[in-house]
UniProtKB/Swiss-Prot annotation:
It comes from Escherichia coli (strain K12). The gene is dtpD. Residues 1-13, 70-77, 122-137, 188-211, 256-266, 333-343, 400-412, 483-493 are cytoplasmic. The chain crosses the membrane at residues 14-34, 49-69, 78-98, 101-121, 138-158, 167-187, 212-232, 235-255, 267-287, 312-332, 344-364, 379-399, 413-433, 462-482. Belongs to the major facilitator superfamily. Proton-dependent oligopeptide transporter (POT/PTR) (TC 2.A.17) family. DtpD subfamily. Residues 35-48, 99-100, 159-166, 233-234, 288-311, 365-378, 434-461 are periplasmic. The keyword Thylakoid does not apply. This is Dipeptide permease D. It is a multi-pass membrane protein. The keyword Cell membrane applies. GO terms for cellular component: plasma membrane. GO terms for molecular function: dipeptide transmembrane transporter activity; peptide:proton symporter activity; tripeptide transmembrane transporter activity. CDD domains: MFS_DtpA_like. SUPFAM superfamilies: MFS general substrate transporter. Probable proton-dependent permease that transports dipeptides.
């Protein structure tokens, strides 16, 4: 590997794949809740349940995907297989109007593909560098920024394709994006020869009457089938319960593994941060469900004579994250003075405060809709942008703290537990919250009248709920600040 190159050539193929994966995933996600309600005519409750189940399980399957990559497939093969499964899933989703079983099957295939892809693409990128290579951080930053580009473009492109042509075309465009990324990645295959490939020895070994490659095929067929049943029977909550129990058990084992009080305090800090992060994301994930339907039903989307497709609003959040992230990275320089724990809680308070402010703006928007029939587009854009800005003070802070823990060999496991709680469980809670907006009545002609008051009430409750979290976090911040101050005074005396 050339140490003098700005970045290894292989990274550009990984980045291209990451852009198209974000394009594929977020393009489809922007359409899903609208497809369920507007095209398949699911009631809001059923749509929210399926949407939250899907968004929850995509954070559970990466655990299995990471295990398969570590033991058998290697990161490169796992990523390619995951990308292929996601493309197939999007194609099948386009045919779901034929029969509901195609809907459940397509979502299950996408969940499995996401599990193989998401947990291993970062590991594949890490394989391109030596442990001490100074280019490593720059490579990960490049991949993160590229992903945001994909998530900005996807809702615009897929939303336009759906609005101007058909739902199948919107989902098909997401599939084309994933296939394009996979083709580009395969074109750079020669640059990945030094990365870990398939473990052929393990694959050929025999266990329980079958070679491991046979069991792998069984797993690749059985897992989508099982997840399809979970979606169909609405049993996904049981899978989350099992995963959470296992995660908490592992967390207890890590706590016992801690060798001193400092390590236990670090773990306690991570657990507390994870709890508040879970609540934050339960609020933030309204963007793909209740907020999306609110925009579709109650926001005036006309701009210069063009009606902006609802799905396009999903780009605002990603654009705010990227724009504000660049601003914070280039302009704001964090001081090393003071106590790091105090700074962490200060950032969490700011993130939750911005989330509360964002929903306060949405509450005003909903009240405007109640008074005048429709809310204004700029007010909606402002609320979503503030919520996107809030994200920068939650996940990066928590993940940074996890990587600092001094208990050896637990960083990956803690990251998985964090994703389980702040991703899977938070998305389930988001579905429960969103369902509170599903109040509707029928007029004499049988048309559905959706209740704007339900949206006002839910947005208002989230505003105050996030503000209550800010109060709790500020109490912790004040306690830590006073403790640090008293310790400093004691040392001076």
């Amino acid at each position: 590997m050339n140490k003098h190159a700005s970045q290894p050539r292989a990274i550009y193929y990984v980045v291209a794949l990451q852009i198209w994966e974000y394009f594929s995933f977020y393009g489809m996600r922007a359409l899903l809740i609208l497809y369920l309600t507007n095209q398949l005519k699911y009631n809001d409750t059923h749509a929210y349940e399926l949407f939250s189940a899907y968004c929850s399980l995509v954070y559970v399957t990466p655990i299995l995907g990471g295990f398969l990559a570590d033991k058998v497939l290697g990161n490169r093969m796992a990523v390619m297989l995951g990308a292929l499964l996601m493309a197939i899933g999007h194609v099948v989703l386009g045919a779901s109007e034929i029969h509901p079983s195609f809907l459940y099957l397509s979502l299950a295939i996408i969940v499995c593909g996401y599990g193989l892809f998401k947990s291993n693409v970062s590991c594949l990128l890490g394989e391109l560098y030596e442990p001490t290579d100074p280019r490593r951080d720059g490579g990960f930053s490049l991949m993160y920024a590229a992903g945001n580009v994909g998530s900005i473009i996807a809702p615009i492109a897929c939303g336009y394709a759906q609005e101007e042509y058909s739902w199948a075309m919107g989902f098909g465009l997401a599939a084309v994006g994933m296939i394009a990324g996979l083709v580009i990645f395969l074109c750079g295959n020669r640059h990945f020869t030094h990365t870990r490939g398939v473990n052929k020895k393990v694959l050929r070994a025999t266990n329980f009457l079958l070679p491991n490659w046979g069991w792998l095929l069984v797993l690749l067929v059985a897992t989508p089938a099982l997840i399809t049943i979970l979606f169909w029977k609405e049993w996904s909550v049981y899978a989350l319960i099992v995963a959470t129990i296992i995660g908490l058990g592992v967390l207890a084992k890590i706590y016992r593994k801690a060798e001193n009080q400092k390590q236990r305090k670090e773990l306690g800090l991570i657990v507390t941060l994870t709890f508040f992060s879970m609540l934050f994301w339960a609020f933030a994930q309204q963007g793909g469900s209740s907020i999306s339907l609110y925009i579709d039903r109650f926001v005036n989307r006309d701009m210069f004579g063009y009606t902006v497709p609802t799905a396009m609003f999903q780009s605002i959040n990603a654009f705010a994250v990227m724009l504000c992230g660049v601003f914070l990275a280039w302009v704001v320089k964090e001081s090393v003075a003071g106590n790091r724990t105090v700074r962490i809680w200060g950032k969490f308070a700011l993130g939750l405060g911005l989330m509360s402010a964002g929903f306060c703006i949405l509450t005003l928007s909903a009240r405007w809709s109640a008074m005048y029939g429709h809310s204004s587009l700029p007010l909606m854009v402002l609320g979503l942008a503030v919520m996107g800005f809030a994200e920068l003070f939650i996940d990066p802070v928590a993940m940074s703290q996890i990587t600092r823990i001094e208990i050896p060999g637990v960083t990956g496991v803690l990251t998985g537990i964090y994703m389980l709680l702040s991703g899977a469980i938070a998305n389930y809670l988001a579905g429960v919250i969103a369902d509170q907006t599903s109040q509707a009545s029928f007029d004499a002609s049988g048309a559905i009248n959706y209740s704007i008051n339900a949206y006002i009430e839910v947005f208002d409750q989230i505003t105050w709920g996030a503000l209550a979290c800010v109060g709790l976090v500020l109490m912790i911040w004040l306690y830590q600040a006073l403790k640090f101050r008293n310790r400093a005074l004691a040392l001076e005396s």
